[in-house]
Amino acid sequence: MYVKINGEIHFIWRAVDHEGEVLESVVTKRRDKRAALKLLRKLLRRFGTPETIVTDKLKSYGAAMRELDISQKHDINGIWINNRAENSHLPLRRREWAMQRFHQMRSLQKFAAIHGSVHNHFNQEHHLYSRQNFKQNRTAALAEWRQLCAC
């Protein structure tokens, strides 16, 4: 995903797990091997080595994974295989539009990091629950959020 800040293009690298939760977000000025390494190292340090890694067909991912010696876990084959990652950009885009864009790379990085955590907390996937269970889960999430903010 890219974002323009003062006419310059910046890229948001996002890692999403199999359930659609945002694991990590990194903002860079380029889409190259160095940027891919930055994201992958953060993920490996925090979550360990995954079973498979699904990406788009950007060559930077393959180069970074070869350097980290995890290229055997890389999966780019299959139609629509990375839809979960692509769809994770939509809530961020909506907030970006509401905030009338970003003006600094630093504020974009802070926002992307925080937005992923907050979205994961409140994203209840209401199509999986009955209305009553959804309301209970949402109320519990809101109570937990208020407790965190009260500290």
Region roles according to the model:
Residues 1-5, 14:
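Two-metal-ion RNase H-like nuclease active-site motif
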Residues 15, 20, 40, 53-56, ...:
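Mobile genetic element proteins and their domesticated derivatives, centered on retroelements
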Residues 25-47:
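Active-site beta-loop-alpha junctions of metal-dependent nucleic acid enzymes
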Residues 50-61, 79:
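Acidic/histidine-rich, metal-coordinating catalytic segments
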Residues 69-79:
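Short hydrophobic/aromatic-enriched beta-strand-loop microsegments
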Residues 77-94, 106-109:
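RNase H-like two-metal-ion nuclease catalytic core shared by retroviral integrases
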Residues 88-104, 115, 120-122:
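Active-site proximal helix-loop segment of RNase H-like, two-metal nucleases, encompassing DDE(D)
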Residues 107-151:
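C-terminal domain-tail junction helix/linker
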